[in-house]
Amino acid sequence: MSILGTVIVGIVILLGVIGAVVQVWPSAPLVGGAILVWAWMTGTTSAWIIFAVAALVLILGTVLKYVIPARGMNKAGIPQSTLVWGAAGGVVGWFIGLPLGLVLGMVAAIFIVEYLRSRDTATAWASTLQALKAFGWTIAIELIAALTSATAWGIGV
């Protein structure tokens, strides 16, 4: 692969890693797709092995980013719909106030949904904090998977 091609792949991987943090665009498809293009264009056995490792890490990360937070929320008695409403509030907040709006919209939506469910401010706030922890786990798991895959690619380059 040419130097320009490698740089473009690296930029797409970087965008994927950033996507793991900002949660606005999908991280795993960007990182995995970029490494797939690199492996295809490079064509070596080691490139395909690196792609396979990266793909497995990204698939595992995608599964775990749903399973681990869901278990924590289930243990706390918070329905999955709360996280869905939080994500919707985050999207609305993003369009109102960009990154800060994303966080504020998510927190507000989770609190409102949980308050309407429990009719208790303390319970709603505790549920909001638990949902935020779950969201944090989602980001951390996706970021670890993206960085691990990016590192595997970096070793291969």
Describe the residue ranges of each PLM region.
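Helix-coil boundary and interhelical linker segments in multi-pass alpha-helical membrane proteins
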Residues: 1-5, 39-51, 155-157
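Alpha-helical transmembrane segments of multi-pass membrane proteins
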Residues: 12, 16, 38, 57-66, ...
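Transmembrane alpha-helix interface/packing and boundary motifs in multi-pass membrane proteins
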Residues: 13-30, 90-99
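Short, non-helical or kinked segments that cap or interrupt transmembrane helices
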Residues: 21-31, 75-84
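Selective recognition of hydrophobic, aromatic-rich stretches within alpha-helical transmembrane segments
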Residues: 24, 28-30, 54, 98-113
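Interfacial segments of multi-pass membrane proteins
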Residues: 30-46, 89-94, 108-117
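Helix-adjacent hinge/juxtasegments
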Residues: 49, 53-93
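C-terminal binding/interaction regions
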Residues: 95, 106, 116-157
